[in-house]
């Protein structure tokens, strides 16, 4: 958070947000690329710890794509993604279990504990938290393509139901749930499910005040190669425009879908925030200016840096 010439003024300013968000639910999704860097992972955990200290109720969801890619390479398994989403064979699913519910998950829990957060790890399989069905083959038109193609994503689950009872039980005892993006089928199958999708579904089911995506860039960018083209405020119409112009592509497309699902489902706002810039999450929560992009269903006024 930027230093103020008058630190007491900064504290008074932040205090109104502390009061406003007290006991509110924030779902925080940590990107896999950031989690692969222990320094960035610990910095994120320290920010989450401060939210918890201020009686904000965080629920953490994590990805793990880069570490899964690394393990697949080591195991000589193909890494295939279409429109930003992973194709998951049975061997790749086994690797995903090792990473998402294993090493990465445990390392994140350890760092949260070290930061003072009473974190408890779950996957979507635990207590039937995330119920899914296998995604059927779908037609996908990738960026730059003129025609779509039929894609079978393999053992990927589309969410059908979210049962938040285990999460609510943990939160009632002042624990912080940390959720890996695996889901369970009614037939006992386990599926790989996009972490952005899981975060949005949980945010809706928990009636979250806010959903945060911590990413490698400052937020939504009008020009993906220009960090200074940050969009500070956007609505769903703006989001659709950025998708149509190609400003949102690749791995950002699942995020756009998740943002839309969350906002239509009643989440107050969705924020894309840097997981690299120091204290960007805290700055987004506790200052007027914020640090990244806030997306809402509709906005009447747009400050400088907004779309349009």
UniProtKB/Swiss-Prot annotation:
Broadest EC class assigned to this enzyme: transferase
Compartments where found: Cytoplasm
One of the record's GO molecular function terms: acetylglutamate kinase activity
GO biological-process terms attached to the record: arginine biosynthetic process via ornithine; L-arginine biosynthetic process
Keywords of the record: Amino-acid biosynthesis, Arginine biosynthesis, ATP-binding, Cytoplasm, Kinase, Nucleotide-binding, Transferase
Family annotation (InterPro entries): AceGlu_kinase-like_sf, AcgluKinase_fam, ArgB, Asp/Glu/Uridylate_kinase
Domain of life: Bacteria
GO CC annotations on file: cytoplasm
Pathway entry: Amino-acid biosynthesis; L-arginine biosynthesis; N(2)-acetyl-L-ornithine from L-glutamate: step 2/4
E.C. no: 2.7.2.8
UniProt-annotated binding residues for substrate: 64-65, 86, 192
Record site feature (Transition state stabilizer), residues: 29, 255
Catalytic activity, reaction form: N-acetyl-L-glutamate + ATP = N-acetyl-L-glutamyl 5-phosphate + ADP
Entry function: Catalyzes the ATP-dependent phosphorylation of N-acetyl-L-glutamate.
Family: Belongs to the acetylglutamate kinase family. ArgB subfamily.
Cross-referenced HAMAP family: ArgB
Protein name (Swiss-Prot/TrEMBL): Acetylglutamate kinase
């Amino acid at each position: 958070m930027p230093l103020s010439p008058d630190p007491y003024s900064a504290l008074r300013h932040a205090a109104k947000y502390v009061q406003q968000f007290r006991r509110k639910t924030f779902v925080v999704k940590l990107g896999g690329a950031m989690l692969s860097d222990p320094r960035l992972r610990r910095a994120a955990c320290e920010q989450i710890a401060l939210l918890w200290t201020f009686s904000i109720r965080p629920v953490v969801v994590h990805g793990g794509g880069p570490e899964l890619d690394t393990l697949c390479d080591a195991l000589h398994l193909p890494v295939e993604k279409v429109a930003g989403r992973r194709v998951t064979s049975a061997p790749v699913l086994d690797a995903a279990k090792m990473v998402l519910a294993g090493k990465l998950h445990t390392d994140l829990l350890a760092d949260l504990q070290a930061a003072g957060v009473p974190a408890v790890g779950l996957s979507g399989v635990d207590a039937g938290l995330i119920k899914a069905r296998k995604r059927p083959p779908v037609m996908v038109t990738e960026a730059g393509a003129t025609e779509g193609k039929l894609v079978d994503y393999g053992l990927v689950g589309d969410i059908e139901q979210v049962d938040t009872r285990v999460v609510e039980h943990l939160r009632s005892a002042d624990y912080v749930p940390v959720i890996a993006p695996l889901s369970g089928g009614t037939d006992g199958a386990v599926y790989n499910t996009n972490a952005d999708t899981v975060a949005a579904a949980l945010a809706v089911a928990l009636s979250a005040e806010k959903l945060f995506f911590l990413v490698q860039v400052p937020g939504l960018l009008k020009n993906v190669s220009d960090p200074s083209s940050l969009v500070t405020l956007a609505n769903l119409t703006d989001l659709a425009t950025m998708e149509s112009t190609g400003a949102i592509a690749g791995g950002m497309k699942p995020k756009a879908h998740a943002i839309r699902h969350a906002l239509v489902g009643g989440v107050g706002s969705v924020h894309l925030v840097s997981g690299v810039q120091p204290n960007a999450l805290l700055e987004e929560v506790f200052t007027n200016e914020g640090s990244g992009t806030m997306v809402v269903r509709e906005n009447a006024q747009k400050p400088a840096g907004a779309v349009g």
